């Protein structure tokens, strides 16, 4: 078996394959605080750093991992309206054979990372609940995409199975109890200096959205402003190195 990911560069119309490994359907793509690509084995049900071994090498097949459910997506907790003790943890959706939204601890070791199950956020005995992706919204709530279908799988059931629901679908909004939405910064229509300063934000999604806006600007204008922004960074800032990494991205 041979599977992996594709990186699409819209302006160049270039598609690059990377991160191959001996498994199937490598779902669950996100990025950690330092921009490292994190994905999940759907069969072995564990997240890992999806690096890019030189062709034809692959990631080794996982061993000793708890293979109990397929995975569709994950997101790291980094919004301030979520409890302090949850910061840096991972929320993950599993779509079969369990139907749940989980909270996991992302633990770093000398030579890699490992996830540790903490608890369920949502668990349903209704098998029509099929969470397939999740993302933070600008107000700090987490949104889960629920396929909501009594039949799942293209191999297990006929494509013409009458029970297939082609119309329904739900979006779940998750917010910690008593938490209030955060005031999102202006991104669309913001000036270049404002967008660059958003790269200092601890919330990954704000940085991601800001970089999307910056990519639409003229490269020479961005480079001039970015060079000045990097030059004025405070080396005593605990996040100084992180800001430099954001500038490279």
PLM segments and residue spans:
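Beta-propeller blade termini and top-face loops
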Residues: 1-181, 185-197, 204, 211-249
């Amino acid at each position: 078996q041979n599977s992996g990911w594709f990186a699409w560069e819209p302006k160049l119309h270039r598609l690059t394959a990377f991160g191959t490994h001996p498994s199937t359907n490598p779902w669950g793509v996100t990025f950690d605080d330092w921009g490292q690509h994190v994905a999940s084995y759907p069969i072995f049900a564990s997240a890992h750093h999806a690096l890019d071994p030189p062709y034809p090498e692959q990631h080794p097949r996982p061993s000793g991992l708890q293979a109990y459910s397929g995975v569709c997506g994950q997101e790291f907790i980094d919004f301030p309206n979520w409890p302090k003790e949850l910061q840096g943890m991972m929320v993950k959706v599993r779509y079969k054979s369990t139907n749940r939204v989980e909270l996991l601890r992302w633990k770093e070791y000398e030579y890699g990372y490992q996830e540790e199950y903490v608890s369920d956020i949502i668990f349903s005995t209704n098998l029509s609940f099929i969470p397939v992706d999740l993302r933070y919204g600008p107000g700090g709530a987490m949104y889960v995409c629920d396929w909501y279908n009594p039949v799942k799988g293209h191999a297990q059931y006929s494509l013409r199975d009458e029970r297939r629901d082609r119309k329904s679908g739900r979006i779940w909004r998750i917010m910690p109890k008593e938490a209030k939405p955060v005031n999102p910064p202006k991104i669309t229509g913001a000036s270049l200096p404002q967008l660059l300063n958003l790269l200092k934000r601890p919330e990954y999604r704000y940085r991601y959205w800001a970089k999307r806006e910056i990519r639409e600007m003229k490269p020479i204008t961005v480079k001039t402003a970015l060079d000045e922004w990097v030059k004025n960074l405070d080396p005593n800032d605990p996040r100084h190195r992180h800001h430099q990494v954001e500038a490279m991205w």
